[in-house]
UniProtKB/Swiss-Prot annotation:
Muscle (at protein level). Residues 38-73, 77-112 form the EF-hand domain. Ca(2+) 1 binds at residues 51, 53, 55, 57, 59, 62. InterPro entries: EF-hand-dom_pair, EF_Hand_1_Ca_BS, EF_hand_dom, Parvalbumin. Signal peptide: none annotated. It comes from the Eukaryota. The lineage of its organism: Eukaryota, Metazoa, Chordata, Craniata, Vertebrata. Glycans are attached at residue 18. Belongs to the parvalbumin family. It comes from Gadus morhua subsp. callarias. This is Parvalbumin beta.
Length: 113
C-alpha cells in the first residue's frame, strides 16, 4: 500500500528491520525506512493509508497490520508489539493514534535512529 510513496529500498529496509516476529523495534524504525525525512504532507499520505477505515485515527487493529502496508508479504505485528506501538504513539490516551500523534511519533523515533 505504501508503494509509490516509499522507494523500493525503503520497503526492503522495513522488511529487514522487522522480518522476525518480535523484532519490531519502535526506536529508530522510521529512520531505518526513511520516514524521518518525509514532509508533513507525505506523512499525512502514509497516515491515510494506515487509517484503513478512514475515521481519522489509527486504531489497534489497523496498527497490527502496519508492516503489511509496507509490503503484503510482511507479517502482522504481535500483540505485544502492537500495544507498545500504540502506547508510544497515543499521547492523549484515547486508545488510538491521530495524524498529529503519528507525525510526532515519526519525529521522536526518527531522531533516535
Amino acid at each position: 500500500a505504501f508503494k509509490g510513496i516509499l522507494s523500493n529500498a525503503d520497503i526492503k529496509a522495513a522488511e529487514a528491520a522487522c522480518f522476525k516476529e518480535g523484532s519490531f523495534d519502535e526506536d529508530g524504525f522510521y529512520a531505518k525506512v526513511g520516514l524521518d525525512a518525509f514532509s508533513a504532507d507525505e506523512l499525512k499520505k502514509l497516515f491515510k493509508i494506515a487509517d484503513e477505515d478512514k475515521e481519522g485515527f489509527i486504531e489497534e487493529d489497523e496498527l497490527k497490520l502496519f508492516l503489511i502496508a509496507f509490503a503484503a508479504d510482511l507479517r502482522a505485528l504481535t500483540d505485544a508489539e502492537t500495544k507498545a506501538f500504540l502506547k508510544a504513539g497515543d499521547s492523549d490516551g484515547d486508545g488510538k493514534i491521530g495524524v498529529d500523534e503519528f507525525g510526532a511519533l515519526v519525529d521522536k523515533w526518527g531522531a533516535k535512529g
